[in-house]
């Protein structure tokens, strides 16, 4: 029997981000590990979460609406990062896995701040905004396809083709 590990998953509020996170969570839980998921209210309303999945809503701040929107988003991201740091310290995950979308950003920033290993997973053929922003700041990048548009060449050594869960 392997030791129980803790995993923190973070995903945006759409099915494209949440369903792969749910799939990984289900597999990790089936293997006896403890898993927590961070998202926004929208994401946690998407059906399909494993019953044993611990969930947390953190502010993330979607960037839109001109300068005022940018400031509001930055403040929300900052607050979400602080809350995610507390969660990481309490939950003590072996790794933080981000699945893209704005709600994954605070947890990935918190992982970096706490020196917790982090991975992003890109489900699409185009690297999304949050994953593009975090690509140079994470330990590994899991991708679903051989060729990913907007993938930073400087991050090629972090890239691992795994497909979609």
Stretches with model-predicted labels:
Residues 30, 85, 141:
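Catalytic machinery of carbohydrate-active enzymes
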Residues 42-46, 95-114:
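An aromatic- and histidine-rich active-site surface loop
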Residues 17-29:
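Short amphipathic alpha-helix
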Residues 65-95, 105, 113:
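An amphipathic, basic-hydrophobic alpha-helix
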Residues 9-17, 98:
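Short, glycine-rich nucleotide/cofactor-binding loops
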Residues 4-12, 29-79, 157, 162-165:
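Conserved nucleotide-sugar phosphate-binding/catalytic loop shared by glycosyltransferases and other
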Residues 34, 42, 112-165:
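Active-site-proximal region of nucleotide-activated glycan assembly enzymes
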